[in-house]
Amino acid sequence: YLYDPIMCCLCMEDLKDYENMRKAMIKHRSFPGFVEDITTFMANTLIGTSDAVIPAPEKRNLTKQFMNPSCCNITERLVYTDPYTDNDHNNKIFEPNRSFFEKELYGDERLHLEVAKLKEAFLSNGQSLIHGDLHTGSIMVKQGAMMVLDPEFACYAPAGYDVGNLIANLTFAWANAETTMQEGAEKAAFRGWLEETIEKSIDLFREKSLALL
């Protein structure tokens, strides 16, 4: 995006030759170059906006610029609160799964404690300028290229939030392939790509982050 407030002009790049990554993975399509691109994005964005790289005054200005109470409230509620409470207003449960939810999510006090720790960290640890919604539905891909969209949830929070969101979505894609694809070479190749991508997402992010310090 490019916005010129003087000319009242908004320019957007044409991405018609890209496709939504989540939809592409539902079709069991793989993107071998994706892990290099996404780890570069995460390292530059997360570490590049942290105290380890930028001066404190610059970080304070960015923190102020990206104060985002309304979207942060959505994250705090939909990620860290509602999934673990018996809230049928937001939790639309497939009835055969209800007993699982009641036992494993609503009734697990140890899980509630760990989630509360994560929520407290999200509220109080402004470590990096995160994307805030870095799932595969916010990524457009084609072979050899990637674009990250939907930055409206950006704020200062723990860097691990974005990394974990990405890993979780890749894991969901693996589970989808495991349960919906016929056994054979195509399934093995797609699962293998996902497993390699998950592993490299951590290793390359660490490597590229250290290179920025």
Q: Where are the language model's segments positioned?
A:
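Active-site activation/catalytic loop segments of kinase-like enzymes and analogous catalytic loops
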Residues: 160-213
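Conserved catalytic-loop position in the HRD/HxD motif
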Residues: 133, 150
